[in-house]
Amino acid sequence: DFIGIHFFSPVDKMPLVEIIKGEKTSDEALARVFDYTLAIGKTPIVVNDSRGFFTSRVIGTFVNEALAMLGEGVEPASIEHAGSQAGYPAPPLQLSDELNLELMHKIAVASRKGVEDAGGKYEPHPAEAVVEKMIEIGRPSRLKGAGFYEYVDGKRSQLWPGLRETFKSGTSQPPLQDMIDRMLFAEALETQKCLDEGVLTSTADANIGSIMGIGYPPYTGGSAQFIVGYQGAGGVGKDAFVARAKELAARYGDRFNPPKS
């Protein structure tokens, strides 16, 4: 029986465990692992095996959207401010340094290969060029002592001043609400895709996993609840969410087009 257990870092502080179920995983194996996670004081969610599972796929869209904004010429401090205003526990450029751009690059390369091997056409995210540039100039992560932020004796000090010149910061400044929505909607849309593809089998797991595992703002109720509970200028609920997603798609790219579901 194959079954995976995905803990979150730091393990002693993060309450969530993502249980990964294979095609032939027995109910008995699942029940035993579920009980084990409860016994060690963790909150489990169950997902079906796929590339990135659920949480890694979704948090990647949050980070990617922030990096895309940086590549568009948005001020780095404005991006961090938008992340904080949206309600995330860590702003996206800071989080990217922790996640490690070299790892993100490897994931993008593997994703491209997976899509192309399956006969599909890979559509690179605008964030990939930013990741490659940062690696090229030797600023891949906090681990290496240099990323989007500067580090002194391992401690984060300030945003690296060279970001402004490297990415021509200040040449673009979208509305703050657009910046906030790009982050929130990117994760919500990816969550819906996970539900559509059967990676997730319940919206409850989506909401619990997104809040407790990857820091989706708690006031939203979770990345699935955000869709049905969305409140915007065009109204309230799923129809309003879809309308706003289409607005974002028209301005920032097809990745914001909502699925038919």
What name fits each language-model region?
Residues D1-S261:
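N-terminal glycine-rich phosphate-binding loop for ADP-containing cofactors
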